[in-house]
């Protein structure tokens, strides 16, 4: 099974280890993943089993050589894990991850490449919208889709963490006023239904 593991700063609950695997649920329980507490022994077991080049893949997923398809698959599975959906993504092998900010950034070319990938996943506002507003709108739309599909609102903190994970690689984390903007967009979108 192909598997890549990206280490974040440490193993405390405030920091995360990001996993990409065929089915991470077979390695760790959902509760452990969602709490962000991955014990050192579990990681050692995982690494000794997989025997994969961790450093090389960490560089790849830090923004170097990131293809459009990889970006789409990554975003789909981040949402899959955050919203705790039971269905498996049909677009690729499951890549499941938990995450937190880490300060990695990429250059402008990679930001644009990744942004265009994410935008293909959602119906967007007219082209007059700014890039920032488009990203926020995409987050709001995904939240509304989840509400309609599962009959409950997703945890906004998880939505924000998903966005912040992407932004630590491709830009800057969401500001407080932008978080509120996403919430207001969700309310407006729900009223239109």
Swiss-Prot record:
GO cellular component terms listed in the entry, alphabetical order: host cell cytoplasm; host cell nucleus; virion component
Name the UniProt key words of this record, in alphabetical order: Early protein, Host cytoplasm, Host nucleus, Host-virus interaction, Phosphoprotein, Virion
Q: List localization entries.
A: Host cytoplasm; Host nucleus; Virion
* Subunit structure, interactors included: Oligomer. Interacts with host HNRNPK.
Modification note:
Phosphorylated on serine residues in the 115 N-terminal amino acids.
Q: Which domain of life is it from?
A: Viruses
The similarity annotation says: Belongs to the asfivirus phosphoprotein p30 family.
**Entry keyword annotation includes Phosphoprotein:** yes
Please state what the protein is called.
Phosphoprotein p30
Induction behaviour: Expressed in the early phase of the viral replicative cycle.
Function (record text): Modifies the subcellular distribution of heterogeneous nuclear ribonucleoprotein K (HNRNPK) and may contribute to modulate HNRNPK functions related to processing and export of mRNAs during ASFV infection. Necessary for virus internalization.
